[in-house]
Amino acid sequence: MDIQAHINEVWPKLHAIAEPAFKEVKTAAFLADFLRKLGYDVTENVGGTTALTAVLDSGKPGPTVAVRTDMDCLLFKNEDGSLEPIHACGHDAHMTIALGVAKLLQEQGLACGRVKILCQPAEEIGRGALAMLEAGALDDVQYALGYHVMPKDMARSGQIIAQINWTACTLMEGEIRGLAAHGSQPHLGVNAIDAGAAIVNAINALHSNPLLGGSIKTTRFMGGAGSLNAICDKVSIGFDLRSTSNTEMLELRRKVEDIVVNTAKVYGAEADCHIVGTCPAAEADPSLLALTQEVISAELGAGGLIPAANITVGEDFNFFKQERPQLKTASLGIGCNLEPRLHDRDMHFDHSALANAINVLTNLTQRILCVKP
């Protein structure tokens, strides 16, 4: 297989048909057609979504290794107000890698077990992995390999991170309900802004274990949009929570909800708080991590291996491990001189570096299939 020719042919086609979450219709059709022509057993519309799976079966007993790619893009607003779909997070690169791995594995053949390509929608809104889990796409999988192109300051071309330690993140929003009154008679009302300000101060006074990287930020505070001489009766408030520990994240959520509800009561207001979205932190398997590091070093040399890296971003791939604890997962970071940053409409990268990812993931898959139970 000419890997560079594969990249040059496939990436532009996927880049040109960028589609947002759960609308990856053309993208999914392209992937399904490509994989079916390789002889994979393709299942489309998994869980009633654009998700698809493709299986290559050796016909011999052994583990099932999943190679996961995301499919969706981001939407950017143009000057005329229109929304433009752009692959600014590298999912076009991820799909190009997955198809390259699928093709190499088909050419090499499998000694035992099965390979399952997971083409996942809606990563950008954190719902695609859960949709595939709910549809049973991971029920027959023992190993799952994820990966992401990384900014240049984390990994350069010729380097691969063996494990990205993604952070757990939770978005929460609440509503504070007071009682409206005229500004000349504040004692007859309940000022939701007063309660909200106290909530923000209480949130800022929380101190989490610095070794776990926990943080809570107030990211929304909206209220009092009416007259300036009216006591505000409603405030909308929002929070961004982060932690490297899934256990600590549960505690942070509890604390935020307690503060919002109980602080509002002190001011005579009512409040509620709920989760809008969440992603768990990465949980690496030690034995798989060691094997991944070994494979990267063998392919790229010692200078090409970055053993692990922490990042404060969330990734819904981590739901696979959280919902299937017996699953062994790895999340690799692909160095490709990516600039200026992810989620920038002008993001660009070294396409030739995708060949490293294709080779490493193919070799890692083959090594896993050779692991003796």
Go through each PLM region and give its residues.
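Histidine/acidic-residue-rich, glycine-tolerant segments that coordinate divalent metal ions
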Residues: 52-55, 74-88, 92-93, 105-221, ...
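Metal-dependent amide/peptide-bond hydrolase catalytic core
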Residues: 197-373
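Structural motif
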Residues: 63-66, 115-116, 142-145, 197, ...
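General structural feature for long, well-ordered alpha-helical segments within catalytic domains
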Residues: 3-10, 23-34, 63, 97, ...
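Active-site beta-loop-alpha junctions enriched in small/polar residues
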Residues: 19, 70-72, 122, 150, ...
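Non-cysteine beta-strand/loop elements that form the S-adenosyl-L-methionine
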Residues: 66-68, 77, 172, 329-336
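Acidic/His- and Gly-rich active-site-bordering loop/insert found
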Residues: 1-88, 92-111
